Amino acid sequence: YNNAKLFSETKLFLDWYAKKYISRNKRLNINIAIKKQIKFLLSKLKLKNNIFVHRDFHVSNLIKCKKQIAVIDTQDALIGNGAYDLASLIDDVRFKSTKKFKDRIYNYYLELNKRKINEDIFKNDFEILSVLRNMKIIGIFTRLAVRDKKKIYLKLIPYAWKLIELRIKDNKIFDNLKKILDFYF
């Protein structure tokens, strides 16, 4: 899993969502601005791409098996950034939860891994990957609604926006992206 793959996936936001909701004459500007921000954010990732990443790690792909949790739907798994799956689980658009609950899961993960990770570096990557992943999801859900006529996915897009807002509001690294999103959306 590399930055080129992450860029390509995040670009689905532009390819489907922006294309549907932004007028043609404004689209070129937003495409340039957001692509620049995606590249900037990807350049700020600090963890190595060196662990198993499920990539679709959310509540719907977890099942209880005896007294353990099993993961299903692993066909998209790759080697990637260690913060990606936690971002997928905590900021899952299919499962609304409070910030307090999200923080509890996040802090529990940090506690379990305190000797293995630098908390500042991990938080940086977690927030970047959450934002990029939710932009990708907005694009995918728009594609499912437009191309495949699966309109049910549209109802999840507002929560994906809330998750993006949650992650970008207090982190200066997102200042330019926030301005762009606020202006156009």
Name these PLM-found stretches.
Residues L62, I79-N81:
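Conserved protein kinase catalytic core
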Residues K116-E127:
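Acidic, serine/threonine- and proline-rich low-complexity regulatory regions
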Residues K150-K151, L156-F185:
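Regulatory N- and C-terminal appendages and interdomain linkers associated
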Residues F57:
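Hydrophobic HxD+1 residue recognition
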Residues L28-I32, S60, D103-I105, K149-L163:
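Short alpha-helical "patches" and their helix-cap loops
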Residues D73-A77:
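Activation of the activation-loop gatekeeper triad in protein kinase-fold domains
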Residues Y1-H54, I63-C65, A70, I128, ...:
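ATP-dependent phospho-/nucleotidyl transfer catalytic cores
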Residues K11-Y21, G82-I117, V131-D148, A160-R167:
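Active-site activation/catalytic loop segments of kinase-like enzymes and analogous catalytic loops
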